[in-house]
């Protein structure tokens, strides 16, 4: 602490400089003027003196007040009367330190220790004087109430027990019992402490510290893993778990103390409670793996470009690739549309090119995004007779997101209605400008049917590849990307891997996302087995533990034990995150259902041939859900339909859908015996349309009202049997019996009900047409007046469909 003057210290401890000089003099510090400097040693000396003097004074100085009360009463029982005298005595003994604590508010700012200690004596003297005045006033009031009683002034003295005078023997026994009980209570209250025990008041005075409560809440940085329990989250924020549960209830989530929540939910809770979330990823094992593998060393050599063919459905993408490969790939796809990512390595006269053929249907957005992610050049196929379509625009966006150049192939120029110039104009609205218009995009008119312009397109692709200077290391551990995966009967999980660098060999340990395994076989795009694959080569890999997710990175690991450890770690982490999100969504659905009616649900067990198709179908079917009906995919997987799938469908009342897969013989027997709805599809259009029809059948019926006729009340007749009969004139349409009606008065609906009787000339009739008079009886309504209008309408059910 820096030296300061006496005046500055007095301002700091909030006392007068003269008072501080007196205390310094008592402490033996030789300072006589307020402008003199006081050192740290002199401050400690002053503080020690104040502590010593204060503890001595507080040990001796106590305020002790004794109050006595006497109450006289007469109890009568028959002819006898008994005088009852009740005497009570109360002693107030209050230490100075306790008075100070009760009267002084808690400090809100942290001040130096010398400030509290210096002012302690002055405050204590004021508090004792205030207490004495209050007690004297109370004694005076007691004296006014009982004038015959002797006044006793409060006395201060040593802490000795004040004994009561004994009661005379003449007192009644009930009075003696009550006084005896009062005496025990008083003895217990004023019990002496042993002489050897220290005085608690002196000890508390000596231990008084200069600590002040924090004036602002403590803001912590809370590290959040990908999933965390509520108890662990509360511990990280140093609060009780009940506080976290309360905060989540305010946010609309009912949780328990041991429930796991995902990282996003935990971050919202932490921010709600005033702390800072820090999102962390538990990737220590993977970081160690990357450090072990390190960067690939070796000389980078030129590699073949990876070209992705994208565009709208039926614009001729696969036909173009078919002409290049001289094979009929299109004939193998159901309905003539591509539903998988096909990876093909083509050797042309100008060089090697790897083609990826992506689906054009809107459901395969994720597939197209993966195709653009692992590609070097995008060939955008646009039909000259059809123009720019939604999936064409989406393909442009994927190419921009992946930052890859685009080559536009204007297909079907052999058709008479082809207009290539219109294609250029439409694409220019999406910032795709041809080179002749000052842009940087190459346009090439082609015909996949006749082969016109195909060679020029390949030249443009290889020219663009030369500009990009594509190179990769062709030796060392391989790295690649999973383009597609499926479960093949007899061969197990099959993954199509596009090698991006290094060289993949038979027998390598391959780690792909949550799956791993030794490469047992490799098959090229031509269907022949191969022993190795270099950069830009697509191969089918057999031997993995399961079907990996399409788009995952594939890495060759030197140790199988390490690959197994990392795969299991990823599986556990994925399971925790999935359960946390599922539980959160389940609780949110509970709150959503509280105020709503029951939502009709269509349960589906979905099986597909490849992972990409399964992913696209799941997303497309989930998009069909509305507020009234919902698609619930209770199970999905890659591979054929098994008995376990059918048993699950039986238990959950679900429809089994197979996309390009079939059920085996025992499964078909079980399906026929149990009557399970099993459907096969090979075209995604048909599958989505059928599910839409099924959902439309689950929609609640909707009724449409149609006004049939309108009658005006001209007179009202009263009948003892029926009640009020309205004599009406039909002014519009036809009035039919037993149809619902509305009674209008001044064009305001005052009653809705049923038409009970319809008569004409005292005869019951089925209907009355326009311009005819009739008598109308309204069921359970007699307040019909002249001038009212009776509107007759009918309800028709409208067939509802999912948009």
Swiss-Prot record:
The keyword Protein biosynthesis applies. Residues 311-318 are annotated as: G1. Residues 302-471 form the tr-type G domain. Residues 411-414 are annotated as: G4. Residues 447-449 are annotated as: G5. Residues 111-121 have a biased composition (Polar residues). The keyword Nucleotide-binding applies. Residues 138-155, 168-178 have a biased composition (Basic and acidic residues). Keywords: Cytoplasm, GTP-binding, Initiation factor, Nucleotide-binding, Protein biosynthesis. Residues 95-125, 138-178 are annotated as: Disordered. This is Translation initiation factor IF-2.
């Amino acid at each position: 602490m820096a030296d300061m003057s006496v005046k500055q210290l007095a301002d700091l401890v909030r006392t007068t400089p003269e008072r501080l000089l007196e205390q310094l003099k008592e402490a033996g510090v030789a300072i006589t003027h307020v402008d003199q400097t006081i050192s740290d040693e002199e401050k400690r000396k002053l503080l020690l003196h104040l502590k010593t003097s204060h503890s001595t004074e507080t040990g001796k100085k106590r305020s002790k007040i004794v109050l006595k009360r006497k109450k006289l009463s007469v109890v009568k029982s028959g002819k006898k009367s008994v005088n009852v005298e009740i005497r009570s005595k109360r002693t107030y003994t209050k230490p100075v330190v306790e008075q100070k604590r009760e009267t002084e508010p808690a400090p809100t700012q942290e001040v130096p220790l010398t400030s509290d200690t210096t002012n302690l004596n002055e405050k204590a003297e004021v508090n004792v004087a205030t207490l004495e005045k209050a007690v004297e006033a109370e004694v005076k009031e007691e004296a006014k109430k009982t004038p015959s009683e002797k006044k006793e002034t409060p006395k201060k003295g040593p802490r000795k027990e004040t004994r009561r005078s004994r009661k005379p023997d003449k007192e009644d026994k009930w009075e003696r019992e009550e006084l005896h009980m009062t005496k025990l209570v008083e003895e217990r209250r004023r019990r002496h402490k042993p002489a050897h025990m220290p005085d608690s008041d002196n000890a508390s005075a000596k231990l008084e510290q200069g600590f002040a409560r924090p004036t602002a809440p403590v803001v912590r940085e809370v590290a959040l893993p990908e999933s965390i329990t509520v108890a662990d989250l509360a511990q990280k924020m140093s609060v009780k778990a009940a506080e976290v549960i309360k905060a989540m209830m305010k946010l609309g989530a009912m949780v328990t103390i041991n429930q796991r929540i995902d990282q996003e939910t935990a971050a919202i809770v932490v921010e709600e409670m005033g702390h800072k979330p820090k999102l962390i990823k538990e990737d220590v094992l993977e970081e160690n793996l990357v450090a072990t593998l390190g960067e690939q060393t070796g000389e980078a050599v030129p590699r073949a470009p990876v070209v992705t063919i994208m565009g709208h459905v039926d614009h001729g993408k696969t036909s173009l690739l078919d002409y290049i490969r001289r094979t009929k790939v299109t004939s193998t796809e159901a309905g003539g549309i591509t539903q998988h990512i096909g990876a093909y390595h083509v050797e042309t006269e100008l060089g090697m090119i790897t083609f990826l053929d992506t689906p054009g249907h809107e459901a395969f957005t994720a597939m197209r995004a993966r195709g653009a992610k692992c590609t070097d050049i995008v060939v955008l196929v646009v039909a000259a007779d059809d123009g720019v379509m939604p999936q064409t625009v989406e393909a442009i966006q994927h190419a921009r997101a992946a930052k890859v150049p685009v080559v536009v192939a204007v297909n079907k120029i052999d058709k008479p209605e082809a207009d290539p110039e219109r294609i250029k104009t439409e694409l220019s609205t999406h910032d795709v400008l041809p080179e002749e218009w000052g842009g940087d995009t190459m346009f090439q008119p082609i015909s996949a049917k006749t082969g016109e312009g195909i060679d020029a397109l390949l030249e443009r692709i290889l020219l663009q590849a030369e500009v990009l200077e594509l190179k990769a290391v062709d030796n060392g551990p391989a790295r690649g990307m999973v383009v597609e995966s499926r479960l093949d009967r007899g061969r197990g999980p099959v993954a199509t891997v596009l090698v991006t660098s290094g060289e993949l060999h038979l027998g390598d340990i391959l780690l792909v996302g949550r799956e791993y395994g030794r490469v047992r076989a490799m098959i090229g795009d031509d269907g022949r087995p191969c022993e190795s694959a270099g950069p830009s080569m697509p191969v089918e890999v057999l031997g993995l533990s399961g079907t990996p997710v399409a788009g995952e990175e594939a890495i060759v690991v030197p140790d199988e034990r390490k690959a197994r450890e990392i795969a299991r770690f990823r599986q556990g982490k994925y399971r925790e995150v999935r359960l946390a999100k599922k539980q959160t969504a389940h609780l949110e659905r509970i709150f959503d259902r509280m105020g709503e009616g029951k939502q009709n649900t269509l349960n589906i067990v979905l099986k597909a041939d490849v992972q990409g198709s399964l992913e696209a179908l799941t997303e497309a079917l989930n998009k069909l859900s509305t507020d009234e009906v919902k698609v619930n995919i209770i199970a999905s997987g890659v591979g054929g339909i098994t008995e376990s799938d059918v048993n699950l469908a039986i238990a959950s009342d679900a429809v089994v859908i197979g996309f390009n897969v079939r059920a085996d013989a025992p499964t078909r027997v079980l399906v026929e015996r149990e009557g399970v709805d099993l459907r096969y599809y090979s075209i995604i259009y048909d599958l989505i349309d059928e599910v839409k029809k099924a959902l439309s059948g689950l929609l609640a019926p909707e009724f449409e009202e149609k006004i049939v006729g309108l009658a005006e009340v001209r007179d009202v007749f009263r009948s003892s049997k029926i009640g009020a009969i309205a004599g009406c004139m039909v002014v519009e349409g036809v009035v039919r019996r037993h149809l619902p009606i509305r009674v209008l008065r001044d064009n305001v609906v005052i009653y809705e009900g049923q038409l009970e009787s319809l008569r004409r000339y005292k005869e019951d009739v089925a209907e009355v047409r326009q311009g005819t008079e009739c008598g109308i009886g309204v069921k359970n309504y007699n307040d019909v007046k002249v001038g009212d209008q009776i509107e007759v309408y009918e309800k028709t059910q409208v067939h509802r469909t999912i948009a």
